[in-house]
């Protein structure tokens, strides 16, 4: 059976991991339609037919870093995690043990990874949104291919810098817009492009963020303040913007956006509420956003925490 080269394997692997490639030049392994949109080649997961797995360093061993790491556990012939950079010690230790990473390839910050000569094929960047730009630019400079969590970066300039450097170096930057690979959206795009449901005039789109997810991520969580991290239109709805553009298949002529904080404000707090749910809040028992219920339930959101094994 014919073996495929590792460069092509990396390009194909980004599809399995859910990456939309950020390169202006066509990539081998993709078919192109008349409007130059890329279609997904069929492939069997777990059977890449390469001599050695693609070696990868994970920058950020949180939820997303572990999702991609688990792919390596499930398909070790495709992906081998050989390094990790993670400042939270319990995450670093668990990820190192899980993937049998050598001590010399453990780092407490992404910068230290690049103090070493290149020692893997690619890096997975699953750091917080405002820590995408630095490691991505450095990885490209050193010749790594990159699997980059969405959004690409907080600013237009940073996004363009990454695009330009990817083109200059010829390296792969695969952005994790995973909805492009969901059967639902693939079929919907096919119907729109074929005209089988008629001519597209307008789209009414709703991002239905579930209420607990909303309170966890965008009220209490890492994205609670748009001045400290990316706003919700990037942190969450970059998926929506990408999938709409992809399904329509035409460039945007103009964009307008507006928004503000409406509900989670002090003046809307119910009578008897406290700063924290655990401070004797009078309405905690009936509150749909109660942290005590959300995080104490073993079948709920407790999995988002790095709890000790005991």
Task: Label each residue range with its predicted role.
Residues 65-68, 132:
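N-terminal Rossmann-fold NAD(P) dinucleotide-binding loop
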Residues 58, 125, 148, 173-175, ...:
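Hydrophobic residues in well-ordered beta-strands that form the structural core
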């Amino acid at each position: 059976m014919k073996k495929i080269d590792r460069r092509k394997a990396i390009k194909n692997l980004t599809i399995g991991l859910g990456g939309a490639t950020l390169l202006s030049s066509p990539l081998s392994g993709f078919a192109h339609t008349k409007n130059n949109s890329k279609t997904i080649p069929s492939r069997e997961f777990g059977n890449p037919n390469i001599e050695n797995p693609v070696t990868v360093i994970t920058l950020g061993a949180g939820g997303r870093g572990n999702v991609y790491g688990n792919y390596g556990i499930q398909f070790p012939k495709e992906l081998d995690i050989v390094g990790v950079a993670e400042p939270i010690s319990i995450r670093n230790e668990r990820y190192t043990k899980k993937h049998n990473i050598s001590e010399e390839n453990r780092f407490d910050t992404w910068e230290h990874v690049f103090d070493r000569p290149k020692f893997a094929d690619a890096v997975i960047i699953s750091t917080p949104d405002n820590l995408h730009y630095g490691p991505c630019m450095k990885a490209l400079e050193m010749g790594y291919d990159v699997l980059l969590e969405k959004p690409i970066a907080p600013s237009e300039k940073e996004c363009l810098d990454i695009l330009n450097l990817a083109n200059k170096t010829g390296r792969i930057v695969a952005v994790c817009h995973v909805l492009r690979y969901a059967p639902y959206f693939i079929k919907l795009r096919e119907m729109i492009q074929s005209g089988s449901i008629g001519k597209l005039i307008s789209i009414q789109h709703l991002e239905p963020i579930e209420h607990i997810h909303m309170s966890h991520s965008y009220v209490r969580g890492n994205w609670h303040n748009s001045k400290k991290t990316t706003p919700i239109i990037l942190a969450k709805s970059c998926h929506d913007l990408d999938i709409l553009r992809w399904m329509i298949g035409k460039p945007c002529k103009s964009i307008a956006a507006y928004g503000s904080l409406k509900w989670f404000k002090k003046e809307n707090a119910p009578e008897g509420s406290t700063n924290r749910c655990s401070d004797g809040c009078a309405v905690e028992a009936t509150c749909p956003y109660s942290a005590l219920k959300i995080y104490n339930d073993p079948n709920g959101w407790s999995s988002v925490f790095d709890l000790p094994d005991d």
